[in-house]
Amino acid sequence: SIDTTFSEILPDYLPKLCVRHIIVSGNKKTKKYIILREMSVGEGDSVLVSNLNATLLKSRDLIYNTTLFINVTVSPRIIDANDVDIIVDVKERWYIFPIPYLELADRSFNEWVDKYNASFNRLSYGVMFSHFNISGRKDQLSLILVNGFKRNISFEYKAPYTNPALSDGETLGSGFLQTREIAFKTDNNNHLLYYKNDDFVKSEWYITASYSSRKAIKKKETFLISFRHIKVADSVISQTYNPGYFNSNSSIQNFFELSYKLQFSEVDNILYPLKGYTNSLLLQKRGFG
């Protein structure tokens, strides 16, 4: 929950106050400037007393919407007739999440038991690891290590603040995936037909990079480029199965992908919004053939 109670009752006769200091507490991991970057008011700013509560409530929502904290309190401390300090107290969430991974290759548990005798060879297992605040700058690292029926070794690192103005960010990711079963075409009833093998029949590796720009609180732009290499077993493109799997007689497909995303967002709570809006535009181009 978020404490919405301000600890000071402001006198009506004060028309305007200057923000002398912003005092932040509770941020054991998160850098102070990451919190200050999200606030709608800064040190040295002048705020009308009639607008102070609304300004602090807005700052509280913006800090909470970083998803770095489970509780945020923002309150004023009157110093004199001209100055006010703003007290920001946060409680950090748990940032490290190792999650076990277990997946059946089949559509249901009953199919796995009845058709494949609950064979462990039909299982994919591993771990997904995420750290949402590695250096205290809201940078995120995700790792996936999966083996078994499917194989997935991938990582992604997001650094949302890479310049002094804290407005630009970058993301880098890469991965290697394999599977022992793929859908190679549909039958006359539009049912998927699958090609299976004890060995891996499809392999894929990719690398992706993106640049994001957030010059204003509400607006974010993201530019992404990625490259993918996909290879299927030669049997998949044989006359028996689907010689035009990639719309060619090749068992390999390489392609680039470019995308641009523009997003405007202003909500009271990014996880459970009750009021506000989010609008986005996505332009994407896959392949240049």
Predicted regions and their residues:
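Gram-negative/organellar outer-membrane beta-barrel architecture
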Residues: K91-V267, L271, T278
